[in-house]
Structure formats: C-alpha cells, structure tokens
Amino acid sequence: MQSNFLTLRNPNIVYAVLFLLVLTLATSLAGQTRATYYVSTTGNDSNPGTIGAPWLTIQHAANTAKAGATVYVFEGVYNESVNFPSSGTESEPITFQSYSGQTAVIDGTGLPVNGTQGLINIVGKRSYITVRGFEIRHYTTSSENDVPTGVWITGSGTGIQILNNRVHDITTKTEANGNAFGISVYGTSKTPITQLRISGNEVYDLRTGESESVNVDGNVTYFKITNNLIHDNDNIGIDAIGYEGVGPVGYDEAMYGDISGNTIYNISGITNPGEGYEYDADGLYCDGCAYVTFEHNVILQADYGIETTSENQVCQSNGTEWSGPNNTGTAAKGRRPCYGRYATVRNNIFYNSNACGNSIGGYAHASKKGSHSNGGGSSYRDVFVNNTLYNNATQPGNDSEGGSTGEFQIQYQVGSAQGDIYENNVVYAGAYDTWIFSYVPFTKIYPAPPATLDWNLYNSAAGYAEGTSIWWGNVNRFKTFSNWQNRSGEDAHSVNTDPLFVDLGDTPPNFDTLPSSPVVGAGSVSLSCSVGWCDPDGSSPDSIYGSTDFLGNPRTKGSGVNMDIDIGAYENTGVAVANSLTVNLSARRHTLKPGQATTLTVTVSASPGGGGVPSGTVEFMLGSRLLKKRPLLPTSATESAATLPLSASQLAEGANTLTALYSGNSIAPCCPVSGPPVTVYGSATSAPITETLQ
C-alpha cells in the first residue's frame, strides 16, 4: 500500500492519468455532439433517431440537435414549420439536409402564419446552421398582418447557410397591403448577421405583395447570394436593403456583399396590386446597400434589370445617413439623400427588361423636409462596368408610370458629387430605341453630370434617332451621337456601331462577339478602386473590373501599359463561340465490389450562356432502366448539377453502361405571361460511362 501510494504521488504519472481521463471525456463528448440523426415520415419521435429507427418530425430533430450534429431527412412530405433553438460552432456546425439522392418536402399547406413566420425559422442569436437540399413550399395567408416566408432568418449570428433548396408557392392573398418572402434575412441587432451564404437555390412562383423574393435587410454583413435561380415572381428578385429601420441606428445597411452567378427571369409587378400593377420590380436591387458586388448574373424579362439607389431620404430617425466601418454618419435631412453606395455592377447580362435595363438615382424628387420611403434617395459611387444590355424597355408602360426608359436610366438626386460611373458597357437598344434617359436637370444642388459615361458601345436596329435615343437632363435635341458627345462632354471615347454579336437570332440570344468585333480591346482599364468598391476579400481586390468575364475567362489581356480589355460582359477569345449545351456524367469510382457504393454527378453547362443556367430535370439511366429523375440546381449562371448515389447491389456483374438524359427547359414570354413557353435549352444526353461490378 505504501509503495502504490508513493507511485501515485509521482507528478508525471498523475498528469498522465489526468490526460487519459480528459481524452476519454473529450472523445465521449465529441461522439455526442457529432451525432448523426435521421427523420422519416414513417418514424416516431420516441425512437432514437437512428437510420433504422428514425424520428417522425424535423422539429423534434431540431430540438435535439446540438453543435456538430447532422440530420438526414428521408423523402416525403413534412407538414410543419421548423424552428432551430440551438447553434453550431465554426468547427461543429449543425446541418439539416435531405438524404442523399432524395428530396424531403417541407409543406405549409393549412399551417397558420403568425406574424412573420417561415417554414424554416432561424431566429435570435443563431450561428453555424446549414439547411440543404429541401423543397420548401405552399405557405400562404389572407391576413395583411401576417407574413409567410419560405426561410426566415432574423436577429444576429454567424455562418448560416441556405443551400440547394427549392422554395416555391409562398404567397400572400392580400397583395395590396400584404407581404411574403421566399428567403428573408433581417439583421436586427448591433451584432450583425454575418458570413451568410444563400447559394444554389431555386426560388419561384411567389406572390409577395410589397416584398421581395430574396432579401437581406438591416445589419447583414459579409454575405454571399450566389448561383441561385429566381423566376416567375411578382416582385423584386434579390434585394440588399438599408435604412428601413430593421437594424439599430448606425447599423442598418446590408453591406460587404457578393451577389453573383444568379439567373433571374420573369420578375414583374404588372399583375401585383401591391406594386400598383406597374412595371417596377427589379431583378437585382441595391436599396440602400453598401459595398456590394453584382457580377456574372443573367437578368432577363424583369421590369428593371438592376437598380442601385435608396428609397429613403431620411435614413434614420436621428438623420443618420450611413454607417461605415467605424459606424460614423452624416446628416441626411431634406435634400441630402440616403444612398445606395459603393455598388459595383460588372460582367452581367441584362436583356428583354420590361421597363429599363440599368437605373440609378431616387425614383422621386427629394422634399425639403424629407421622409422615409419617399423615393428621395440616390446613388453614390456606384460603378457599372463591362455589362451587356440588349433590348431592354420592351413594354410601353401605362398612364400611372409613364413610358419605358430604355437601357440606362438616371433618376433623381444625382450629380457630379455623387461620383457614379458607367463605362465599358455594350448598350444595344430595342424597338423603343432609348439608349440613355436622364430625368436630372442641370441644377446647383446636383450639378452636371449626373453620371460619368465613357468607353461604351451603343447601337440599335433602328440607329440613332434625335429626340429618342438620348434624353439628358431634359435636353433631347442631340442631332447625332457625335453631337451628343461634343455638347455633353460625355462618352468621349464611346462609339456608335454594331458590336457584332455572334447571333442575336439564336435561342437563347448569343451575346458573345465575333473576333472582328469593335469591342475587342476597345475598353478602358483606367478606373482605380478609389472611385468605387473593390472587395478586398474577393477574387479581384485590386481591380474594379473583376478577374474574369461573364464566362470565367480572364477579364484583361496583357499587363502594365500593354493591358487591354474588351467592352461588354465577354472577353473575346478570338473564336466565334456558337451556342452549345453539354451534359456530362461522372462517377467518383468506376469499379465496385459487393457492398460498395459511389456517387454519380451530372453537370449541364451552357455556352456562352445567354439563357442563364440550364434548369429542369435529369434522368439517371442504367442501360434502358430509369434509376431516378432528379432536379437540377444551379452551380453558376451557366451550369447546373444533380447527384445520385449508386450501390453495387444495383449493378449486374461485369460492365454496366450509364447515361444521363437532360429534359431541357423553357421560359414563358413575360410580362404578364403572353404565350406558351419558349425552349431555351433543348433536351440532351450525356456520353455513356461504365461502372464495373467485380
């Protein structure tokens, strides 16, 4: 006994024993927190949540899951509104996702809506939660006071991810004064919602009244809204918002964001009483946002392609104009507007918009007193570079809203002090032949110019028309394009000529340019980051033009004094790129033994991608036998993908041939819908691959 006692007093041995105890405890806790659970429509919440004995409800799983947990939900319909009471951590997030190769449906049919409520609710101080691969659908209200939402995130937190979901049929039946959202994020605290990611989702068939399809509002920082497909909704597609009183004073701007790779179409307020039955819904909107990059997006058949401004003239109750990195502000009373500021809009395609392609400035005159949501805001240091615009302003407008305003619209409260820039853009006007439309007169309050324009290429099928093609500060009598250049001092290096698109008559239109195009090497690389916003954490921290063009090719050629850049969204490769669609089927492994499995992946890629992302479905075929049909979800503005697990038990011994059949996709004429859908990308089949069972 004496000997053993003395041995245990040896400090090295004591430390070793303690270490083993701590290690054992840590391993035990890790095993608990990194748990894997399962939910099934045939389960029971009294079960342990294993794959063999799953739970019945997603809510029970949410109540149970702690940091590090992963919850797999088997396919089926779950009629519930799910709240997440716990947070994950950066190293141990909480993940909820459909089981591999399946899609679980969260359906709101018949469920009540209380206040603002989602089918997915991440409310309060919540961090590191991922929701992936669900269909979220059918949630509605008849009450003006209630707001149904597909995904509702509010409060503060870090690292929330909403990935690869299909959100649809979220509606308010009282659109004149009501609201609904597809995905909505409200930062309501001095602590932001930050490192948010909304990616790979399809959001469609929404009736949102006075609200948006997807938004971030208030104190939301360092967010990414990327590679989503948003379509057939009756209000704004993606909106980054400030000054609405969602966040505290000085913390009320959605800022430091990346909105890229999205395809948005058929977005219009013309059938929405909440929008006054007008063509006023934006595909992309910076409404009081700050330091946001919009790039590599395709916007077609929206009312406005993109608008950067602020709807508010008095940003906060104490007159705070904006918060900055140090939360400083400037008074914003009266004629000094709030701004959508430091928005960089680059390498996008905007076409067939109903009212306007690109727009800056407040939609109404600022008043002497000023007020919230009066349209009296404006745009500050917003830079539009290397975009391609075609045939925008396709609708004549109506008595309440006036006529269409063409490709580039300049509204109110903008002048030389605001520093807005429009360069290196291809502007090809449609039937109304309006290239530039500026409401802004030359005044002392907002002295000319309302924006700096240069190095653009303008054209239209009808050619330049005096009194139509350019309206600038209530002056429209520019007899020729050169007369416009001389009298205004704008567009000194711009040209009026045919850009030589590869094929406007193809479906979709091919906006890449021929090798002989006048856009080649004709742009400018003279703008520095000091004139606008270059994301220091993005792909091009030192260039306002971006690192790649719309298709992902290098944005510039050469270096130093020999560097050049094309005009428009595409950098010419020296080869005329015809429209093409590629379906590719791959597998992680091509040889399986009994008991093994692999994952099949189909990608559908469009080039040069004028129709945006290929959507629809893909059929995984084993010989002539259908394994499963899966929905495609976007991975960029020109590519989508679907996956399916494949087990050895599904194969015959020896070589097995697999292919993937793409359905194709169509887009209806809009807006309103005025005919049958038009095929954008036709059906196609992948090359076969072989899986061998040994």
Task: Indicate where each model-derived feature is located.
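Short glycine/acidic-rich loop motifs that flank beta-strands on beta-rich extracellular proteins
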Residues: 78-84, 108-119, 140-149, 171-181, ...
